[in-house]
Structure formats: C-alpha cells, structure tokens
Amino acid sequence: MLTVIELLIGVVVIVGVARYIIKGYSATGVLFVGGLVLLIISALMGHKVLPASETSTGYTATDIVEYIKILLMSRDGDLGMMIMMLCGFAAYMTHIGANDMVVKLASKPLQYINSPYLLMIAAYFVACLMSLAVSSATGLGVLLMATLFPVMVNVGISRGAAAAICASPAAIILSPTSGDVVLAAKAAEMPLIDFAFKTTLPISIAAIIGMAIAHFFWQRYLDKKENISHEMLDVAEITTTAPAFYALLPFTPIIGVLIFDGKWGPQLHIITILVICMLLAAVLEFVRGFNTQNVFSGLEVAYRGMADAFAGVVMLLVAAGVFAQGLSTIGFIQSLISIATSFGSASIILMLVLVILTMLAAMTTGSGNAPFYAFVEMIPKLAHSSGINPAYLSIPMLQASNLGRTISPVSGVVVAVAGMAKISPFEVVKRTSVPVIVGLLIVIIATEIMVPGASSAVTGG
C-alpha cells in the first residue's frame, strides 16, 4: 500500500512541476518548490532527508535546508564553476573575434555542403567521439555548447537542433572504461573486456548510427513545422580584426582535454585547462596591441558571462538537484524497483519492464547514474532466480538510464544546454525525444539478437 502512495505522490508532484514549467513559470522556482514539497512530505512520513553519505543536523527541518547548502557548495564548487568558466570562455571568444574567424574560415569548405543537416550529423559524430574523453554528460554538453554550438548555429543549423546535438552524445555509453560499464560487467558476471568490447560496444555503435539518422529527419521535420529558415551567415557581413589563427582558440579546451588526460601529459581538471586557454587568449590579445587596459576590459566580458551562467544555469541545476533528492527520499525509485521484482520470469518481458522503469526513473530524477545503480544491484538475484543471462538484463538497462537522462527536463545536461542556448528545457527534450526512442529500440533489438536470454546459453556455450 505504501508503495502505491509513494508512487502517487511522486507522480502528482511531477505532473504539477511539468504543468507550471510548460505554462512559462520560472523552471528554477518551480523545481525548488516541487523538491521542497517532496522533502517535507518525506520528513512527515519519517524518511531520512539527507543522503547516507551526509551527517544529519539533528533536526529534519534543518536537514532540508542543509541539503540545499550541500548542493549549492557542490554545484557551485565543481560542476557549477566548470559551467561558469565555459560560459565565460565562450563569451570571451566572441568578444575577441575568435568565433567569427571560425565561421569565416569554416564557411569556405562548408559552402559545398548544401544541407545544414549533414553538417549537424558530422558534428554529432564528433561529439560522440568527445564522450570518450569527457565522461560527465553535463560537462560534455557544456563543453560542446561553448565550442561546437556557436559554429553550428552560424553555419545555418537552428538553435534547437544544435542544442539537441550537444545534449545527445552521452545518451549512449561509448567508453568501455566508464564506471557504469564496469558496474554493469560485474552485474552481468562477465570479464570487462568481453562485456565492454565484444558486447556493449557494437550495440552502442549501432544505436549511435541509428540516432544520427533519426536526428537528421527529426530536426528537419521540426524546423519545417516551426518555419525555421536556414540562412548561412554571409561571410561578407563578418567584420573582425582577429588574425586567422584565432579560429583555433575556441577549440583549445577540447584539445586540452585530449592532451591532458594522464596519458599524453599530466591529468588536469577541465577548469585548469580552461584557465590555461583563457590566459593563452589574453596573452595573444596583449601581444596583438600591447594595450593592457583593453585586455583587462575583454576579460571583464568573460566574468560577466560567468555571472550570467550562475543565474541562468547553475541555480537551475541546484533546483533540479533538490527535486531529484525529493523524489528519491519519498521512495519513488524504491517503489519502481518493487514493481520490477513483481513481474514474471519471461526474459523479454522482464528485460522490457526493467528498461522502461529505469528509463522512467532517469527521466523523473534527471540522473543517469542513480536509477541504474539502484536497479543494477538486483540484476544478479533476478537473473539467477529466473534463469536469465544477467548480461541480457544489464546491457539495455545501462543504456536506458543514459537515454532517459537525455529526455529529462530536469537532468543536468538538458538544463545546462537549454540555459546556454536560451531555450526551454522542454524544447531540448522535444528535439532529443525521437532520436532517443530510436536509440532505445535499437539497443533492445540488438540485445535480443546478440545476447542470449537464457543463462544456460552462456554456461552451456
């Protein structure tokens, strides 16, 4: 009975939050209120408000405020600062004319490609490869927004389509060494090499190709439906005094991430890399004119870009975190797990139920990790009791959690991308929805073809 009540409370609050955001209310305010309501109800029901890793203040009422403080410190101190630095860097690149120079140089070879959608797909594949270097979905999305997004928009790709491309790469796990893959391999009771390279990687590549094709047709359909015209920026209209080599500057963070990964050079945090990139740009600006005042004034533009990112993106991430914690403490995720365990032992039915529940949990909480980590614990037990191959359950669940995050209006990557693109999170979700559904279907079909469903097929083979 309690499971039904917890699910009902979660669904009612989710519907209420969605309704007010769609009506145009501040997403930050609505998510804060929704999260606080859930946390208060959780406290009244006797649930612990703070995560297990945090120490209680001794009073439930102050624990709620304490969690907001924890989020403010963690979001602002690490992820938030990274977002602010990237937004400040992007603003500085525009100010010094580096972004204009990228468009000016790129437009010459790109003019031979008539369709902006082909350029968009090329950008998507590049972004997917970047996911091998940047494991954080939000971090990758923000990095792409600061580098690829301005280029895509300026060569004729609509803002919505470009934002969807930046939000999509982490929807499918490509890296064979990510924490999620390691955990899934353990649950699947397979060696990591076999699980990651022989099974998961081919399924991931198939899903990425399918999503790329879906992006091409879906973004084109939405642009036509919304009467969005694609006009390549006239190169003659671009007036910049920046030298041609400045076109490399917007991409220095990507180059830095690839170089300073611990293999080619020292392993540096992306914020450290961004500081180096901004210092490099500032030094070049000084060498160009030997005008210290102009250099310092230009850096002020970067600082204002950081401030705008705090107000528009970081606080929205904090609010989304409060909402996700509210759903977790109310018992919403645990209720979904209880539903999954109540289904029969037919392999395809159990797999589909787990995939749907994992995806729903990811969509409502905005987290790709939390639902998968919650569900993956029960895979070995479920698999053995039902005579099912654990890998048959873990692979689609692994991908479903990340796909669900990509169509969650409260996920960090969607919120950050929408904030930087200055569009609604629901617009990003609409743009990513069909590619995500296509990706999920391919994952399910490929798993059915490539992974034996019965555990006897594994042990007997």
Residue spans of the language-model regions?
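Long, contiguous bundles of hydrophobic transmembrane helices that form the permeation core
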Residues: L2-I14, A18, L31-L38, S42, ...
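Membrane-interfacial loop-to-helix junctions in multi-pass transporters
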Residues: T3-L7, M73-G80, K108-A122, V155-A161, ...
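Short amphipathic alpha-helical coupling elements at transmembrane boundaries
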Residues: I70, M101-Q111, P150-N154, S297-D308, ...
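Hydrophobic alpha-helical transmembrane segments of multi-pass integral membrane proteins
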Residues: M82-M85, Q111-T147, L316-A320, F343-K381, ...
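Interfacial loop-to-helix junctions that mark the boundaries of transmembrane helices
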Residues: M1-I5, I22-G24, S53-G58, V65-D78, ...
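Membrane-interface alpha-helices at helix entry/exit sites of multi-pass transporters
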Residues: K104, I113-A122, M152-C166, I193-T199, ...
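Alpha-helical transmembrane segments and, especially, the helix-loop junctions at the ends
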Residues: A127-L144, F149, N154-D194, M211-H215, ...
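Core transmembrane alpha-helical segments of multi-pass membrane transporters/permeases
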Residues: F32, A52-D100, I271, V275-Q334
